[in-house]
Amino acid sequence: MDTDLNAIKKVNTRNNLIFIADVVLFFILLNTLPFTPEANKSLALLVFIAILWLTEALHVTVTALLVPILGILLGLVKSKEALAAFADPTIFLFFGGFALATALHIQNLDRLIANKIMAMSYGKLSVAAIYLFAVTAFLSMWMSNTATAAMMLPLAMGILSKLDPKRDHNTYVFVLLGIAYSASIGGMGTLVGSPPNGIVATQLGISFAEWMKYGLPIMLILMPLMIGVLYVVFRPKFDLQFEQSFEKIDLTPTRILTLIIFALTATGWIFSSKINPALSSLLGLQSKIASFDTIIALIATAVICITRIATWKQIQEGTEWGVLFLFGGGLTLSAILGNTGASKIMADGIVAFIEGGHYYIIGLIVATFIIFLTEFTSNTASAALLVPIFISIAEALNIQSLGLALIIGLGASCAFMLPVATPPNAIVFGTGMLKQTEMVKAGFWLNIICVFVIGTIGYLFWF
């Protein structure tokens, strides 16, 4: 107990010192930067928020709330404009995603899907491991990566319990890391799969279906590469048949209705570009429905409550409100930097160093930067901070802003080396069945592969 208290005191002392130093630096920059008064204020605010986000001296959500507060007090943005970002359509799209995930979880459909697919392995450990990874990735496309990893872990441990933890240690590590990494990679596949995706989509006006054109191929490429890396590094043994004993979950009318709502929602998101004009014409509207993906999400949320599939309280508890506030803070900061010219000042400064470099090399450098940065920082906070800056850099370099933004957004989900990097990493590390050095060994090579995959595809198709 005393050890825990001492550790908490040390963390609090560290965070307090960082916060005080950050405040001092804020006022120094405010009075010494050589640009226009508005740009000086914006850049000082950016540095202040960036330090808090990257060090997590304050909770990232609290820091996000400081953005509109300080922006208003510094005269950089009006109250209505600052708070409007917290009602951005993408925030409500993610809220609908949380509601849908809650419905699947409350009705035990996530477990039902997992059990049905695992039953197809017929007791073969190698097949079961691949199915575990595939189901984890699929569910992470629609649910929180954290919730998916937490749900799949007991299923994996039940299968691994037939093995000897010492003799078959490498097989344990292979399966556990595969679940964590599949959760992160799966989150790249859809717009609602991971918060950084939504940040990029909001900045560039990308729809759900458009995001899948970029994120899904990356996901499908990285999944087999991830499995290959884990196999080469750990050489697991699969010479075992295991008995299948999954909990019985009946397909009740309520669960069938939930699956129908899920299927209709996913279909609406994927084919929104065709459904929207047809529906608008049918309703006699003059133009297409704006933010159609978000409207679909809100309809799904309402139907889930109306049909009693999940209660409002359950949806409240299943929603990561901090993530939604972080979205709002990031969008407000982006607007402030753009309106005051601070983004252009930073972009011009960075461009001065990299101008003339080959676009492929620039893409690799950006991918390396974001992937290794998010080993130590929140991927959502990093994306909220960096996406608008790199959009400005792309514009200054006269290349597609889509390219660098996607590299940042997708690269932010590729933190595989450390337990603290992502919640799925922490969840499997918490089993005590693997060492940090083992995660670092596999994660480092997977990080490098992600750098080249994302950087190369970015150069060939996004720039």
Which sequence ranges carry the predicted segments?
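Membrane-interface alpha-helices at helix entry/exit sites of multi-pass transporters
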Residues: 115, 119-131, 162-177, 208-215, ...
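Alpha-helical transmembrane segments and, especially, the helix-loop junctions at the ends
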Residues: 98, 136-153, 170-206, 223-231, ...
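Cytosolic regulatory regions of ion transport systems
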Residues: 3-13, 119-123, 136, 142, ...
